[in-house]
Amino acid sequence: MKKEEKISAEEVKRVKGLGCLKDKRYEDIFNVRVLTRNGKITAQEARVIAEASDRFGSGSITMTTRLTQEIQGVPYDKLDDLFAFLAENGLKTGGTGAKVRPVVSCKGTTCQYGLLDTYDLSEKIHERFFEGYHDMKLPHKFKIAVGGCPNNCVKPDLNDIGIVGQRVFRRDLEKCRGCKKCQVEANCPIKVAHVQDGKLNWDGCNNCGRCAGKCPFHVTDDYVEGAKIYIGGRWGKRTAMGRPLSKIFTDMEEVMEVVDRAILLFRDEGNPGERFADTVARLGFEYVEKKLLGE
C-alpha cells in the first residue's frame, strides 16, 4: 500500500482490536502493543521486540501504563508481517477493547515492603482472566492491578479490581507495657499507632506490617498475611476511588474467585458503555459486595 493512503474507519477499528493504535499524524502508521506478563519479559523476548521495531517500525519502543511494550511507527502494510514475526517468537499483540485488559503488578515479590507474591498472583490472573476470558465481551474495559503493600505503587484502588497485600496482626495487648518510648509507635510510617491510657492504640492501621517484631514484649510478633480487594476504582477524565471489601483474604484462590465473580457480574449486569465503577454505583456497593463474596 502506498504511503499516506487513507485506511477505512472500519479497518482502523479492526486493527485497534489487535493492539494497533493509529498515529494521528499519518494516515497509515500505527503503534503496536506487544503483550507482556504484567510487565515481565525475558532477555530473548526483549531482543525479539527490539528486532521487530527495527524491521517493521521506526526503531522506537515505549511502555504503556499497563506495562505492554509499544512498537512505534509501523506502516499498515507491514502489520501482518509484524504479527507473523512476533508469533514465530512466542509473542502477540493486543491489550485494547471492551474486555479484561493486561494485568499490572508491582515488584512485591522481591520488594522489601512486599506482603504478597505479586508475580505469582498476577500471572495466575493474567492466565485465567486476560487470556482465558480474551473473547468475553464486556460493557467496557476492565482493569486489574496487584499491589504488594499499602504503598500502592501501582494504584490498585484506581482500577476496576485492585488487590493490595496486607499484614494483619493478632495483637496481644496483655503483653503491652505502655512504654513511654513505644517501638511500635516509633516504627509506624503513617503515625497512627500510639500509647493511650497505658496501652497501644492503632485505630486507622493500614496493615502495612512495618511494626512486625518491633515490640520487645512481642505484641506484634503474631500476624497473618493476606490481601485487601478494592472494587470500582477508575482513573481518567472521571476518577473514582475504589472501595475495599469488608474482609481480608488469606486464601489467594478465594481472591481469584472474587475477581471471577466481579468480571461475570460486570458482564451480566453492567450496561453497555459503562465502567465497573458506574455499575457498582448503580447497583449499590452492598449488593455488589454480597455477590462477590458469594453470599
Task: Locate each region found by the language model.
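Iron-sulfur cluster-binding cysteine motifs and their immediate structural context
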Residues: 181-200, 206, 210-226
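Small-residue-enriched alpha-helical segments and adjacent helix-cap loops
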Residues: 4-7, 32-179, 204
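A hydrophobic, small-residue-rich beta->alpha segment in the mid-to-C-terminal subdomain
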Residues: 225-227, 233-270
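Short glycine-/aliphatic-rich beta-strand segments at the starts of folded cytosolic domains
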Residues: 13-40, 104-108, 243-244
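Bimodal "functional hotspot" detector
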Residues: 271-287, 291
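Short beta-strand elements
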Residues: 19-22, 161-165, 227-235
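Short, flexible, solvent-exposed loop/turn segments with mixed acidic/basic and small polar residues
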Residues: 21-26, 57-63, 194
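Charge-rich, low-complexity segments
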Residues: 1-24, 284
